[in-house]
Every structure is written in C-alpha cells, then in structure tokens.
Amino acid sequence: RVSKTKPLVILKAGKSEVGMKAASSHTGSLSVNDRVFDAVCKRARIIRVENLEELVDVVKAFAYLPIPRGNRVAIISFTGAGGVMSADSCSRYGLSVTDLSENTLTRLQSNLPSWGRAGNPIDAEPLFERVGAESSIRLSLEAALEDDRVDCVSLVLVSMPVFDFNIARLISGFKLRYPEKPIVVHIIGLKESVDSHTRKLEEIGVPVY
C-alpha cells in the first residue's frame, strides 16, 4: 500500500547462496530466495536497487525531480558514447528513447551543418560546432522540452573549458517553463570541474550523475 503513494526503494543483501548463508549466520533467521523476493518487489511496485551507489542515485532523483507524465526520454549528448550509454540505460530500466516530432527534427536539422542528422539521441556536437556551447545547450533543451512526445530529458555534457559558463543558470529557466518535465544531467570530465557544475546544478534541484 505504501508503494502506491510514496516510492519505496530497497537494497537487499544476501542475493547469492553464499550471501544468504552469511545473512542467516548473522541474524539467525532464514533468508528469502532472491527470485521470490524480486518477484514480490515487482508485484508491489517496490524499486529494488543493486548497490549503495544505485540507492543514493535513485533517492536523489526522487528528492529533486517531479514525477514525469510518462516514460518517453529525449537524450541530448555532446559525446557519442555518452548518448549510446544513456540509450542503453533507458532500455534497461524500461524507458523509451522516443521518436521526436517532425517539427522538432526540422528545427534541429535547420541548425546543423550539412553532415549532421537530427534524431534521438540528439547529437549536440554538430550543433556545438555550428552555434557554440551555450547556444547548443539552449537550442537542444528548448526543442526537446517543447516536444509533446517528450516526458523527460537526459543531458550528457563533457567538462571542457568551453562549458565554463553557468550551466545551472541556463537550465533553471527551462525548469521554470517546464516544471512537469524532469531534467537529469550527466557530466563526464575532470573532478574539479564536474564538482563545480554539480554543486550549482543540485542547488537548483537538478540531479547530476
């Protein structure tokens, strides 16, 4: 009953046979078969995580983000590998990398160089080469968030000197305009720069991974 009104996240130790024996010797009680426990979680709509890092990530998302209207994701990535990994993660967790509307594709294509192709994931690197770092983020976010086929956005950035502007300030405007559409940011790069962006983004309620 709790899971219908408030998200319930569980991290269970003792998944393997060895782990179950260790749990039994520690608590003196029998451990539940992991497949049975997994089935119970799915039936009760309980979110099961695999490790402490995933637990923190999931709880952070619930703490910062609104519940999206659906599972349709637009991925905006400044690195090909980052976009592909985001698409893989969406597939793994039941999210749909949605087909963007024709209007959105046309809008993106008009700002791309001749060799660029609009799609989802949105490859923002060609946009960056054409219009610059800040404008490429703004244009991509605006196009994705205005699309009725998009419920949430995953933005994958690379920490480089060209991104040394206040990304949080830019994104905060979109949060105000589209409060019902969650925005999640992933940053790849040097720790010092990543930490700086992370602090500013999470201050405005945008989780960074």
Predicted region positions:
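Peripheral docking tails and interdomain loops at the edges
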Residues: 10-98, 170-209
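Short glycine-cluster motifs
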Residues: 20, 69-158
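Short amphipathic alpha-helices and their capping/turn segments at secondary-structure boundaries
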Residues: 2-4
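Charged helix-capping and loop-helix junction motifs
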Residues: 138, 166-172
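Short glycine-rich, flexible loops that bind phosphorylated cofactors or substrates
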Residues: 161-162
